[in-house]
Amino acid sequence: ADLANLVNEAAILSVRRGKKTIAEPELKESIEKVILGPERKSKVISAKEKKIIAYHEGGHSLISAMLPNADPVQKVSIISRGQAGGYTLSAPTEDKRLHSKNYFLDELAVLMGGHVSEKMFTNDVTTGPSNDLERATRMARAMVTRYGMSNLGPRTFGKKEEMVFLGREISEEKDYSEHTAEAIDSEVSRLIREAEATAEKTLKEKKDILEKLVKELLEKETIEKEDFNKLVGIEIAQKNEEKIERKIKGEEKLK
């Protein structure tokens, strides 16, 4: 159903723009609309809130760019979509069937990035990160109770009952003591605190880049992948690596 919705949205956009076929821009836009909701450009946002949202999304996107295991940023925007004040769109460069502990740790830091950025650079915290905190808590709990990625060791906690035909969890049977429940909560909190510390360290080290991102977001409202990579220095790093690789290959040929 989701795939059909994506194609339908892309087809509608293509027709509106006088195109006979669905092209990549329409497909990307339809993905954003279906996943995040329609743009709400008409929503009036104060200058103060706009700045907070810019720091929030700047925090998410910059941490995603700086941590090696996080998904690359495709787009960052402070235009409202659905219930969100702004959004950072990230996606893996290839299909993944397996996810590592390091991936989850970096993604936790990305999720905490909006909250940390608000706290560090606006001297306040808002209700904006509520969904991020919920997702971070779910991810950390899954690491502890489902994937054995914590100090409690390689085991699972809790038996889940599922509706087989719908693939949906309906309940969870508790197969551990209250003492273990406290240990699980403690591990979840530890993972989130460490992710918060990683986010804070990254933003402190890259403060100048964050300020550039915020300035660009306030001026343009949306930054696409190519411009984002230039702002944070990813493109330069990639080009330098390519130059070194070509140089090494050239030297090898001379030998």
Task: Explain the meaning of each model-derived region.
Residues 28-33, 82-84:
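Short, conserved phosphate-binding/catalytic loop or strand-edge motifs used
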Residues 51-55, 61-255:
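Soluble catalytic regions of large protease machineries
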Residues 1-3, 45-46, 116-121:
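Noncatalytic linker/hinge segments flanking ATPase motor cores
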Residues 1-25, 32-40, 61-73, 143-150, ...:
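AAA+ ATPase "lid" subdomain C-terminal helix
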Residues 41-52:
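Short pre-active-site segment immediately N-terminal to the catalytic Zn-binding motif
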